[in-house]
């Protein structure tokens, strides 16, 4: 899809270490967990859930991820809570859309990197890698209807 500007936002996050093979399973569990937390605490949701890749070790096949839910206002959680509020600062990025299940995730990431290289865009390592779940299993849809933005 090309270059776009990601607006800043506040979000709830739960951070875990996961094997890459279990990433989808963990995300599928944690998104409803965050939604339930926001509903129980009357926190207004302001967008679709997303994942931030804090680190990826492809050799060990593990990743540290934050499963996130955008919210309208900044909140403060109790000390020791497994859910915290953070802020995503706005930035310019390359946008790639994957239609279908996540088995094609690597191909989508490769297309984004190819776009960066082809168009001589600068890859800024300080900007987090995001996956936004526009339409997913949590919406009760079949895999062919899923849409993920990278």
Regions found by a protein language model. Name each.
Residues 1-150:
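A solvent-exposed interaction/effector surface
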């Amino acid at each position: 899809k090309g270059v776009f500007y990601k607006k800043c936002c506040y979000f709830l996050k739960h951070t875990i270490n996961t094997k890459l093979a279990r990433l989808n399973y963990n995300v599928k569990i944690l998104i409803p967990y965050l939604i339930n937390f926001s509903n129980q605490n009357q926190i207004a949701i302001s967008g679709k859930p997303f994942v931030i890749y804090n680190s990826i070790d492809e050799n060990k096949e593990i990743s540290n991820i934050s499963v996130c839910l955008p919210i309208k206002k900044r909140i403060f959680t109790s000390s020791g809570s497994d859910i915290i509020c953070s802020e995503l600062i706005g930035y310019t990025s390359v946008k790639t859309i994957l239609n279908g299940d996540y088995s094609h995730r690597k191909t989508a990431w490769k297309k984004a990197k190819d776009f960066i290289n082809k168009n001589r865009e600068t890859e800024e390592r300080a900007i987090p890698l995001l996956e936004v779940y526009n339409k997913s299993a949590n919406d009760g849809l079949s895999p062919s209807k899923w849409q993920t933005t990278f």
